[in-house]
């Protein structure tokens, strides 16, 4: 009798032990599940340069939306597209239930950003980067927000090497007897061609490549064909703002330009076929991945001319 009582008691204890173990495991699982959900990142990226960094940090899976200036590869076609990064809609963003909105320093309007903050959505602006130091700081900030600090180390190393390569190309070009003269033109449907002078994003790219921007005024100005012809540019850089979805090749763009402005065929750039396109993304957000790439392309063109 005593043996049977002890056996029943032991069975009861074991059953309770198994019950508490199962309860503990289920509780831990629920905690881990809740913790995982709380750490889930749903990102809205507003600004071409910011979105480039998100992709470079291998954080595309976190994106729920980007603004209209951002370029996305085809496999991310399902990511929602918002409006212009200066004119964002709070309702459009909140409908996507993001946890984080990151944009350039001109992201806005402030009324929209304030509504998002009141809804407990984290909003972060990254300063425009005119120099390498700020670009690297922006990468670190974004990497911490997206939990990609390991990716940031490699990205910063890669960009530093590319900028170092541009510095070396600048030195090579500085040894030429005459510094190449570059003209940047912005073409926009319904408006005349505008030339980019000092203080523009194009001016930064030209300087990075080690060349001279022959437009000596500040900002953008409209110039006639005769005015451009008098400058005698060695290379013409073109960027377009249009509703056309398919990008044109350098040759197609050059042909379209010379058809519209035939006098430019008499410039050194027109005679030698040195008219090349500049991706619109390279002109947004200051020094970034696209701007560095554009400077590399321009430097390569100029070095080939010198050979």
Each language-model region and where it sits:
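His/Asp/Glu-enriched short active-site or ligand-binding loop at hydrolase and phosphoryl-transfer sites
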Residues: 67, 196-221
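A short, structured surface patch at a secondary-structure boundary
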Residues: 42-96, 100-106
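Short secondary-structure boundary segments
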Residues: 47, 105-106, 128, 218, ...
């Amino acid at each position: 009798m005593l043996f049977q009582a002890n056996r029943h008691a032991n069975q009861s204890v074991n059953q309770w032990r198994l019950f508490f173990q199962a309860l503990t495991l289920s509780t831990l699982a629920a905690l881990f599940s809740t913790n995982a959900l709380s750490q889930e990142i749903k990102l809205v990226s507003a600004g071409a340069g910011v979105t480039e960094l998100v992709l470079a940090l291998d954080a595309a899976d976190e994106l729920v939306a980007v603004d209209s200036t951002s370029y996305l590869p085809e496999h991310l076609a399902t990511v929602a597209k918002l409006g212009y990064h200066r004119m964002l809609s709070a309702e459009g963003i909140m409908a996507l239930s993001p946890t984080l909105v990151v944009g350039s320093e001109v992201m806005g309007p402030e009324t929209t950003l304030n509504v998002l903050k009141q809804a407990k959505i984290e909003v972060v602006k990254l300063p425009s980067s005119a120099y390498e130091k700020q670009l690297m700081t922006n990468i670190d900030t974004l990497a911490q927000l997206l939990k990609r600090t390991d990716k940031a180390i490699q990205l910063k190393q890669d960009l530093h090497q590319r900028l170092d390569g541009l510095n070396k190309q600048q030195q090579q070009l500085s040894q030429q007897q005459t510094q190449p003269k570059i003209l940047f033109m912005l073409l926009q449907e319904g408006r005349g061609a505008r030339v980019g002078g000092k203080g523009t994003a194009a001016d930064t790219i030209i300087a990075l490549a080690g060349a001279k921007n022959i437009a000596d005024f500040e900002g953008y100005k409209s110039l006639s064909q005769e005015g451009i012809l008098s400058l005698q540019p060695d290379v013409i850089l073109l960027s377009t703002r249009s509703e056309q979805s398919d990008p044109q090749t350098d040759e197609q763009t050059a042909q379209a330009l010379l058809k519209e402005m035939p006098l430019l065929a008499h410039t050194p750039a027109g005679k030698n076929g040195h008219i090349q396109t500049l991706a619109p993304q390279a002109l947004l957000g200051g020094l970034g991945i696209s701007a560095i790439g554009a400077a590399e392309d321009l430097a390569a063109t100029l070095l080939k001319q010198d050979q």
